[in-house]
Amino acid sequence: MKSKLKPTNDWLVTDDNPKMREVCTEVKFPLSQEVLDIIDKMLAYVDESFDDNAEKYDIRPGIGIAANQLGLNQRFFYVHFTDFCQKEHRYLLINPEWIDKSLNKAYLAVGEGCLSVPKDKDGYVIRSETVKLKGFDYLTQKDVEISAHGLLAMCLQHEMDHLEGKFYYDSINMMKPYFKKDEWVSIDQKVCDQCK
């Protein structure tokens, strides 16, 4: 499933738009043309990033995008990336819901970025180390349950935050951006042995 659209940064809604702080509403089935059009844009933008074509289209590369980042405040998002263990992940989740989030914490060692945040914010984004969620995967046309750790867990939480009107930098300690506890897991290439 591939889009024929040519992605552009003009599609993106940025964090200075108050609509990005609104909680997104549930998607109704059957899917409207408006939802299908946003899905097409999601596939175009993230898949061209995945295929290393961001420079070709002069777009900021991204591994995930939520519907509200493209102007529709409804509950769906798309992720497509290869993790540190070279495993490909690709989901377009509609009406996702958390089943479980671990009390153990983790963070991406390199920090996080966002297509809707033009100027990156430095610091560790503290999240749950492991998560489990469910939703309808548009790509497989099935209800799915996903258990995740590592980069996938961080990415899913990042996109779910968007659906709640939150940004990654809301979870950075503004007084001590790089504060961490010894028991928190640093997600980087060293965690690859956990993926096997």
Swiss-Prot record:
InterPro entries attached to this UniProt entry: Peptide_deformylase (IPR023635), Peptide_deformylase_sf (IPR036821)
Enzyme Commission numbers on file: 3.5.1.88
GO molecular function, one term: peptide deformylase activity
Catalytic activity: N-terminal N-formyl-L-methionyl-[peptide] + H2O = N-terminal L-methionyl-[peptide] + formate
Residues that hold Fe cation according to the record: C114, H158, H162
Cofactor requirements of the protein: Fe(2+)
Active-site feature positions: E159
Coiled coil: none
Sorted UniProt keywords: Hydrolase, Iron, Metal-binding, Protein biosynthesis
Gene Ontology process terms (BP): co-translational protein modification; translation
Function: Removes the formyl group from the N-terminal Met of newly synthesized proteins. Requires at least a dipeptide for an efficient rate of reaction. N-terminal L-methionine is a prerequisite for activity but the enzyme has broad specificity at other positions.
NCBIfam families, per the entry: pept_deformyl
Family designation: Belongs to the polypeptide deformylase family.
Protein name, UniProt field: Peptide deformylase
Organism of origin: Mycoplasmoides gallisepticum (strain R(low / passage 15 / clone 2)) (Mycoplasma gallisepticum)
